[in-house]
Amino acid sequence: LDYTIDDMTEASVFEGKKAVYFTLGCKLNFAETSTIGRLLKEMGVRTVRAGERADICVVNTCSVTEVADHKCRQAIHKLVRQHPGAFVVVTGCYAQLKPEQVSAIDGVDLVLGAEQKGDILRYLEERLPLLPAERKLADAEHEAYTVPTKDIHTFVPSCSCGDRTRYFLKVQDGCDYYCTYCTIPYARGRSRNGSIASLVRQAEQAALEGGREIVLTGVNIGDFGKTTGESFLDLVKALDRVEGIARYRISSIEPNLLTEEVLAYCAESRAFMPHFHIPLQSGSDEVLKLMRRRYTTKFFAEKISRVKELIPDAFIGVDVIVGTRGETEECFEEAFEFIRSLDVSQLHVFSYSERPGTMALKIEHSVSPEEKHRRSQRLLELSDAKWEAFYRRYIGTEAEVLLEKSRTEGVMHGFTANYIRVELPVEENLDNQIVRVRLGDFNVDRSALRATLL
């Protein structure tokens, strides 16, 4: 099973149809949606333009929090209203975890779980020719195709272009960690991956299409290699050799899997950028234990110090969950002080959300929504201060920036190797080019540093 077009697939069913795509959640979901889009395009389906009605709606869902579930339902209702009569397919984590809930939503024609989404063309080919009335009859039977978590085995490849400069290459899927707050292992199955040879081919193809930067995505990418007997370090070395790709970023890697060898290689690498995203989740050892995370605060602090020792300019983003069960006021204060002490550049702060079926529900102490909000705000303020301090260190320095067109009139944006966002007056011929600049002060909305070309 693969995201590929079977020779038997009947193109006439798809010819001239228009599709709309809606994605919620992580970079991995966005990569998978655009791969589905590419498949349908090859079958003659084009993306709708503003104001047009679609024949096919594809919704790729997220279920990381209760809010995510709610947003998914809202998005489906909205698309059904905007595109009456369209064939509506829902896939992704919410579809895998709650297929009955999703198929019961008015207007949904087909629900595909994690193991089925790679086969979307076959499912559509069988059902698209049906008249809306016949589809409604099928709807009454709730057409949902999923398998139990233990039977999710397929690695569905995906390399997609988020914009013209940056590609997202899916290297791994699933997770074997079963942290107590998280439903992702149930939604995406066991850890599995593509082969290094197949991933190198996809990177080479991205380079041929003009891609300059690739972000490696997955659920637990440091765990790469379980299915193929390879390692994440082997993958990094192989991708570093692909001609035409100037930059790689590692989307997120567990602290215990960011090994000394991987760090040392990235420090000397041709194309792996000094930019890491490392989930911490809590700065309290007591809470880390309740979460079943695989490290202590001491280990985490040493890892951050080691990154900075080997790669002093590295941008380090850190995930933190606030208000989990068991996070008492004392635990939070301890966590806050620990996080303040870390030399990191930005915090990604999430409020804890109760997920049905997770082990965290057995923990007695719970935190009120108001208290969660207060803790979030304190961490967000800390994040802003760390982010600004990191940017300020580079004002007046020279840097290489990969430029991309901006939605803002008259300017272009891009990122330095160490992920500082940069703003320049627009010059069309510089789109998707790497240029040398001098970094100046903050722009008007303080979202980037102004820069001048050298």
Predicted segment positions?
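Short glycine-rich, low-complexity segments
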Residues: S345, T358-K362
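Conserved SAM/AdoMet-binding glycine-rich loop
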Residues: V88-V89, L97-K98, L208-E330
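Short flexible coil/turn linkers enriched for glycine and charged/polar residues
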Residues: G162-T165, C175-D176, F272, S282, ...
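Terminal RNA-binding accessory module
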Residues: T4, K362-L454
